[in-house]
């Protein structure tokens, strides 16, 4: 028996049977993939070779195993000791270690399986895909943005808007004559257009204010603008408070570009009154129009003067949010450059001219060419970056969280006061014992009118009490 089992301690030469088994393993898809994976894994060669030789040699045992009921037989013990002992490398590498998620081979069905990922299934929940879900839903729904432009005529408001969004919003506009301009009052006009860029849809609404500042007497010419902003807040408040709130259209004004004339030494009284009347209702971004009529030193002095007067009169223009601590340095430098550029000195042009072999949008003068998108000539690129690329969502957030919430709080407070007054009147009516309700005070009355109404209410109450006393006396006498 010892002689028959002596082959187990020696290496088995590679014969035809082993070659056939290897060929069979190579043809089998699952075993071939497993064999190749174990063979390629670092440090697994001794295990692979020993295991392969053992699997090949064991079927060649010809002598039957003794049928002894005693499991502690010496032959059994001797035969068990003749099995090859594991080497040092096999003691530390009894089985391939599990792969990390990053080094795990991807399944060939990974592209078709939405749950297949490089993360470990036991450690990966899936809520990291929430930003992608929000992104898909937002892109599918589209975005709304309402921009108001205000300022006197001739400052390039329409041209700048067309240059910002590369579209013609004033295709059907008619220029008024001199007599019509004299009789013209401040109007509110809306231009809506759908813009799509790389699959993202934007519904842009431009609110224009023709006739603003064109009259000789411009007293309270800003009132129609303020009333329009309040009307949009009121309409949104009604829709939000209604039963069906699925398809609420947001027409609130998110930003107001106020154009300041380059002629003069700062802000005019009309500019101050307009911005003070609207700075609690809308995000105001001051614009220094027609910057090509000023030299670079004049532009710098004009900007400093306007910033000083804005601070002096307590005007609250749109404030850029502070950068987060984890923002990169390039973004922080860009944000600082935008803050220092207020008011933005801009130039608008829809004409394409040729400059140094390039076709650019700009204005051609006898002494040279002014390029609209050249940062050295104007702040058009900075304004577009702020308005469209970096702070459009923040403008909408400030409108919703600050300006609209202020209007909403005022509406709720006024409604609460009216309800309290009505309850007090009903209580007094029940105490007086009359079925005739006391007329309510109309909203918006002055203090003198309210005082007069209260006096009349007291007089009516005394007369009712006298009438009840007379009725009781008449009943007692009868």
Curated annotation (Swiss-Prot):
Binding positions for GTP per the UniProt entry: 151-158, 185, 290-298, 348, 363
Name of the molecule in the record: Septin-4
Gene name of the encoded protein: Septin4
InterPro entries: G_SEPTIN_dom, P-loop_NTPase, Septin
Residues annotated as domain Septin-type G: 141-414
GO MF: GTP binding
Protein modification: Phosphorylated by DYRK1A. Ubiquitinated by AREL1.
Organism: Mus musculus (Mouse)
Biased composition (Low complexity): 94-108
Subunit annotation: Septins polymerize into heterooligomeric protein complexes that form filaments, and can associate with cellular membranes, actin filaments and microtubules. GTPase activity is required for filament formation. Interacts with SEPTIN8. Component of a septin core octameric complex consisting of SEPTIN12, SEPTIN7, SEPTIN6 and SEPTIN2 or SEPTIN4 in the order 12-7-6-2-2-6-7-12 or 12-7-6-4-4-6-7-12. Interacts with SEPTIN14 (via C-terminus). Interacts with DYRK1A. Interacts with SLC6A3/DAT and SNCA/alpha-synuclein. Interacts with STX1A; in the striatum.
Annotated segments matching region Disordered: 1-115, 428-449
Protein family (similarity comment): Belongs to the TRAFAC class TrmE-Era-EngA-EngB-Septin-like GTPase superfamily. Septin GTPase family.
Tissue specificity: Expressed in the cerebral cortex, striatum, midbrain, cerebellum and spinal cord (at protein level). Expressed in the substantia nigra pars compacta, ventral tegmental area, projection fiber bundles and in axon terminals surrounding striatal neurons (at protein level). Expressed in hair follicle stem cells (at protein level). Expressed in small intestinal crypts; abundantly expressed at the crypt base (at protein level). Widely expressed in the brain and to a lesser extent in the testis, lung and liver.
């Amino acid at each position: 028996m010892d002689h028959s089992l002596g082959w187990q301690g020696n290496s088995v030469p590679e014969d035809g049977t082993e070659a056939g088994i290897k060929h069979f393993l190579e043809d089998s898809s699952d075993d071939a993939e497993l064999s190749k994976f174990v063979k390629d894994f670092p440090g697994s060669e001794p295990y692979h070779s020993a295991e392969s030789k053992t699997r090949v040699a064991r079927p060649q045992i010809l002598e039957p195993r003794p049928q002894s009921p005693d499991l502690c037989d010496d032959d059994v013990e001797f035969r068990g000791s003749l099995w090859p002992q594991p080497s040092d490398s096999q003691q530390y590498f009894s089985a391939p270690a599990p792969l990390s998620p990053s080094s795990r081979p991807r399944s060939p069905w990974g592209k078709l399986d939405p749950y297949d990922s490089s993360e470990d299934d036991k450690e990966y929940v899936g809520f990291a895909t929430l930003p992608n879900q929000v992104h898909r839903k937002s892109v599918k729904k589209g975005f709304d943005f309402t921009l108001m432009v205000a300022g006197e005529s001739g400052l390039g408001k329409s041209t700048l808007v067309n240059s910002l969004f590369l579209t013609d919003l004033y295709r059907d506009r008619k220029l008024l004559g001199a007599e019509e301009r004299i009789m013209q009052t401040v109007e509110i006009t809306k231009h809506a257009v759908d813009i799509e860029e790389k699959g993202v849809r934007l519904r842009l609404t431009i609110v224009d204010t023709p006739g603003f500042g064109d009259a000789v007497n411009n007293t309270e010419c800003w009132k129609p603008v303020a009333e329009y902003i309040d009307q949009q807040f009121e309409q949104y408040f009604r829709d939000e408070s209604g039963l069906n709130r699925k398809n609420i259209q947001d027409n609130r004004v998110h930003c107001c570009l106020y154009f300041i004339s380059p002629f003069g030494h700062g802000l005019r009284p009309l500019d101050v009154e307009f911005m003070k009347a609207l700075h609690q209702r809308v995000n105001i971004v001051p614009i220094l129009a027609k910057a090509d009529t000023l030299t670079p030193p004049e532009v710098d002095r004009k900007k400093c003067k306007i910033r000083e007067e804005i601070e002096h009169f307590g005007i609250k223009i749109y404030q850029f949010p502070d950068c987060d601590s984890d923002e990169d340095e390039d973004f922080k430098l860009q944000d600082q450059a935008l803050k220092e550029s207020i008011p933005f000195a801009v130039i608008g042009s829809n004409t394409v001219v040729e400059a140094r072999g390039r076709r650019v949008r700009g204005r051609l003068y006898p002494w040279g060419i002014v390029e609209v998108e050249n940062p050295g000539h104007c702040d058009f690129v900075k304004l577009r970056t702020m308005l469209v690329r970096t702070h459009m969502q923040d403008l909408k957030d400030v409108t919703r969280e600050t300006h609209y919430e202020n209007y909403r709080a005022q509406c709720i407070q006024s409604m609460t006061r009216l309800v309290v007054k009505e309850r007090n009147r009903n209580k007094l009516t029940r105490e007086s014992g009359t079925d005739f309700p006391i007329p309510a005070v109309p909203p918006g009355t002055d203090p003198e009118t309210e005082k007069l109404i209260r006096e009349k209410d007291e007089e009516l109450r005394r007369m009712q009490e006298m009438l009840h006393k007379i009725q009781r006396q008449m009943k007692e006498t009868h």
